[in-house]
Design a protein with these regions (language model features):
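Aromatic/hydrophobic pocket-lining residues that form π-stacking "cages" and hydrophobic walls in ligand
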Residues: 56, 87, 205
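Conserved glycine-rich beta-strand-loop-beta hairpin in the small C-terminal domain of fold type I
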Residues: 148, 164-173, 183-196, 223-226
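Substrate-binding/gating loop at the entrance of the active-site cleft, primarily
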Residues: 1-5
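PLP-dependent enzyme catalytic core of the Aspartate aminotransferase-like
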Residues: 25, 207-217, 222-248
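A generic structural signal for well-ordered alpha-helical segments
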Residues: 60, 176-177, 209
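Active-site phosphate-binding strand-loop segment of PLP-dependent enzymes
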Residues: 10-82
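Conserved core segment of the aminotransferase class I/II
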Residues: 89-90, 95-166
Length: 248
C-alpha cells in the first residue's frame, strides 16, 4: 500500500529516553503522518516525563503528525515517585492523539483479547473506527467483564503484584550487573529487563544465553543484536534459576 516506517531509537544515559533529534528530523518529512509511541517504553522500561511528552507534542503538532500512544504497561510503574501521564490527558496532545490501553499485561488476561482506544477528537475517532472496521474484532462479553473487574475490584492484588515485581526487578538488576560482560539500567516500569551483553565479546549473545539454558527475547527484534530482554514477571524461584544459569 506504499506505506513505510522508520524506527526512532532510544538514547541511553542515566536512563533511557527517546532520540528527540531523530524524531524531529523524521517528523519534518512530509511523508510522515503518524508517530507510534510506547509509554512506558518497551523494552527499556522508561516512563516519559511531562517535559518529554510536551516535546513530543511540540514536534507532532508542528508537523501535523498524529500520535498513537501504546500505554499497555501503564499500570506497572515500579519506581517510587514515577508517574504515568496518559498522552490523551495532555491538553496539547488530546486533539491529535490515540491512546491504546488494556488490562491484559497487568492482570494477565491477554487471552481474552480485549483492549480499548481513547480518542478525544471526534473526527479522529471516526477515522479510527472506519479504519478498524473488518480488521479489528469487537471485544467479547467475557473480556469486557474481566477488564471491568480488573480495574474496579483488584486494587489490593495489584499493589501486592507491584511489590513482588519491584523485588524481582531489583534482584535482576543486582545480579545482572555482577555478571562479567552484562549490564543494565533499572527499569522504571514493566516486568521486562533490557540487558546489554555487548561486553561479553561473543558473536551471538542469544546463542550464549540459550547455551546456558535461558531463552530471552532476542535483542535483534529491537534493533540491538548485542542485547537481550528478560521477562521477570514470574515466580522468584524461576527467576533465581534463570539468573543462576546466566551467572554460571
Amino acid at each position: 500500500d506504499g506505506t513505510s516506517s522508520e524506527t526512532i531509537s532510544s538514547v541511553e544515559g542515566a536512563r533511557y529516553t527517546l532520540d528527540f533529534e531523530a524524531l524531529e528530523r523524521e517528523a519534518a518529512d512530509p511523508k510522515c503522518k503518524l508517530f507510534i509511541l510506547c509509554n512506558p517504553m518497551n523494552p527499556v522500561g522508561s516512563v516519559l516525563t511531562k517535559a518529554e511528552l510536551d516535546r513530543i507534542a511540540e514536534i507532532c503538532n508542528a508537523n501535523n503528525v498524529k500520535l498513537c500512544s501504546d500505554e499497555i504497561h501503564c499500570d506497572l510503574i515500579l519506581e517510587e515517585g514515577k508517574q504515568h501521564i496518559p498522552a490523551g490527558r495532555e491538553s496539547n496532545l488530546a486533539e491529535n492523539s490515540v491512546t491504546l490501553m488494556a488490562a491484559s499485561k497487568t492482570f494477565n488476561i491477554a487471552g481474552l483479547g480485549t483492549s480499548f482506544a481513547i480518542i478525544p477528537n471526534r473526527q479522529l475517532r471516526q477515522a479510527f473506527t472506519n479504519a478498524a472496521a473488518g480488521i479489528v474484532p469487537w471485544v467479547t462479553v467475557l473480556g469486557l467483564a474481566a477488564t471491568k473487574a480488573a480495574f474496579t475490584q483488584c486494587d489490593e492484588w495489584h499493589q501486592q503484584q507491584l511489590t513482588y515485581l519491584r523485588e524481582n526487578r531489583d534482584m535482576v538488576f543486582n545480579t545482572v550487573n555482577n555478571i562479567d560482560g552484562l549490564k543494565m539500567l533499572k527499569a522504571d516500569a514493566t516486568f521486562l529487563a533490557w540487558v546489554d551483553a555487548s561486553g561479553l565479546g561473543v558473536e551471538n549473545v542469544q546463542q550464549w544465553a540459550e547455551e546456558k539454558g535461558v531463552g530471552p527475547s532476542p535483542g535483534i527484534d529491537f534493533h540491538k543484536a548485542d542485547h537481550f530482554r528478560i521477562n521477570f514477571g514470574c515466580s522468584k524461584a524461576m527467576l533465581q534459576d534463570i539468573l543462576q544459569r546466566l551467572a554460571s
